Swiss-Prot record:
Record-level Gene Ontology MF annotations: DNA binding
Protein name as catalogued: Probable transcriptional regulatory protein SGR_6014
Stored HAMAP family: Transcrip_reg_TACO1
Gene3D superfamilies listed in its UniProt record: 1.10.10.200, 3.30.70.980
UniProt source species: Streptomyces griseus subsp. griseus (strain JCM 4626 / CBS 651.72 / NBRC 13350 / KCC S-0626 / ISP 5235)
Keywords carried by this UniProt record: Cytoplasm, DNA-binding, Transcription, Transcription regulation
Localisation: Cytoplasm
InterPro entries attached to this UniProt entry: Integrase-like_N, TACO1_YebC-like_2nd/3rd_dom, TACO1_YebC_N, Transcrip_reg_TACO1-like, Transcrip_reg_TACO1-like_dom3, YebC-like
């Protein structure tokens, strides 16, 4: 299991009481707007919109905010911005490769925010292509464990193209090719299994094992990057042991 998955799980548990909740809501709303603009407002014909709405609902974003975001994205309500996706590449402390996915209406602001966060937290920017080759784009579906076993999940998703099921503690992570993600999510739904999120992520092909000090440094960098309103996702190729994670969480 990747260190970043553990970190994301830890943050997920804290999300409801986290001081950044408003910032999280804004990013989820932005996802919905962009999905509606690019694929239309009808969820039946827009699986990306379905998944953006699902993730927002699971994070307790109010329904009225979700509905407004869909309307803005579809041009049915004023106020929508023209967002573009930009990927930045860099290295964090201990040579950890970092991919930063931005969704922004101001390219210069996004670039500045990312550069400042990187340089102030032991990181450095890298040329396009110098880091991204260390990652593969995969479909990742996160589902609450509840009473489910790993075999329950495997039985539901194996024929839909799932490559692996990872136990993240309180959740399961189902990994597939990005093109198979909707089929995996649909298979879970048909089996009556609820899911928290389904999205295409960049997963590392190799990982850097970090000790407690290294873990704290990379988490500080990720936090600084995610503080930017323009940064939607941060992907990194590090791993930490359960023992180290417990110390960091303490």
């Amino acid at each position: 299991m990747s260190g970043h998955s553990k970190w994301a799980t830890t943050k997920h548990k804290k999300a409801v009481i986290d001081a950044k909740r408003g910032k999280l809501f804004a990013k989820l709303i932005k996802n919905i707007e962009v999905a509606a603009r690019s694929g239309g407002v009808d969820p039946d014909g827009n699986p990306t919109l379905v998944d953006a709405i699902q993730k927002a609902k699971k994070s307790s974003v109010p329904n009225k905010n979700i509905e407004s975001a869909v309307k803005r994205g579809g041009g049915l309500e004023a106020g929508g911005a023209d967002y573009e996706t930009i990927m930045y590449e860099g290295y964090g402390p201990n040579g950890v490769a970092v991919l930063i996915e931005c969704l922004t209406d101001n390219r210069n602001r996004a670039a500045s925010d990312v550069r400042v966060a990187m340089t102030r937290n032991g990181g450095s920017m890298a040329d396009p292509g110098s880091v991204s080759y260390l990652f593969n784009r995969k479909g990742v579906v996160i589902l609450p464990k509840g009473e489910l076993t790993e075999d329950d999940v495997l039985g539901a998703v194996l024929d839909a193209g799932a490559e692996e099921v990872n136990d993240l503690g309180e959740t399961f992570e189902v990994v597939s090719e990005a093109t198979d993600m909707v089929a995996v999510r649909t298979a879970l739904q048909e089996a009556g299994i609820d899911y928290d999120s389904a999205e295409a992520n960049f997963l590392p092909t190799m990982q850097v094992e970090l000790d407690e000090e290294g873990a704290r440094k990379i988490f500080k960098l990720i936090d600084a990057l995610e503080d930017s309103d323009d940064v939607q996702n941060v992907f990194a190729n590090f791993d930490v042991s359960d023992e180290v994670m417990e110390k960091v969480d303490a």
